[in-house]
Amino acid sequence: MKLQLVAVGTKMPDWVQTGFSEYLRRFPKDMPFELIEIPAGKRGKNADIKRILDKEGEMMLAAAGKNRIVTLDIPGRPWDTPQLARELERWKQDGRDVSLLIGGPEGLSDACKAAAEQSWSLSALTLPHPLVRVIVAESLYRAWSITTNHPYHRE
């Protein structure tokens, strides 16, 4: 199984790239994790936000292909670390690759939400999307460590 983070936005601060890369390199070869960045649509005073969201959504879904789609969204289901580890095990048993979608400033398109098999809420708080990349990578690495009895996670 391959994990794929599909995120809107291409120019992240150095600290985001450093943090994300740190967890990316820790993933084992039998569970590769990749980042696919979708260019954010131009937002301005008179921007058609729905059209921008729809275009970003089309690109995200094209990148995900036939993968299991999991959206990152506030109204999604909150998983604690052991629950995420169980989800990761289910995904591995399913055999399909998994695409986790992070929207832009206005969130995800309706098409992305409709295509999702699951929706994961990291918090009821609104989090900066660059920070979400790092949190997701660390959370998935921690979940993997539980499933393999790796000493990274401590109870």
Swiss-Prot record:
Reaction(s) this enzyme catalyzes, per UniProt: pseudouridine(1915) in 23S rRNA + S-adenosyl-L-methionine = N(3)-methylpseudouridine(1915) in 23S rRNA + S-adenosyl-L-homocysteine + H(+)
CDD domains xref list: RlmH-like
Keyword vocabulary terms for this entry: Cytoplasm, Methyltransferase, rRNA processing, S-adenosyl-L-methionine, Transferase
CC per GO annotation: cytoplasm
A Pfam family reported for this protein in Swiss-Prot or TrEMBL: SPOUT_MTase
Gene3D superfamilies: 3.40.1280.10
Coiled-coil blocks: none
Location, primary (coarse class): cytoplasm
Residues that coordinate or bind S-adenosyl-L-methionine: 72, 103, 122-127
EC number, UniProt record: 2.1.1.177
InterPro entries: Alpha/beta_knot_MTases (IPR029028), RlmH-like (IPR003742), tRNA_m1G_MTases_N (IPR029026)
Domain of life: Bacteria
Localization: Cytoplasm
A GO molecular-function annotation: rRNA (pseudouridine-N3-)-methyltransferase activity
Subunit structure: Homodimer.
NCBIfam families (UniProt xref): PRK00103.1-1 (NF000984), PRK00103.1-4 (NF000986), tRNA_RlmH_YbeA (TIGR00246)
Membership in a protein family: Belongs to the RNA methyltransferase RlmH family.
Protein known as: Ribosomal RNA large subunit methyltransferase H
Source organism per UniProt: Cronobacter sakazakii (strain ATCC BAA-894)
High-level lineage: Bacteria, Pseudomonadati, Pseudomonadota, Gammaproteobacteria, Enterobacterales
Gene it is expressed from: rlmH
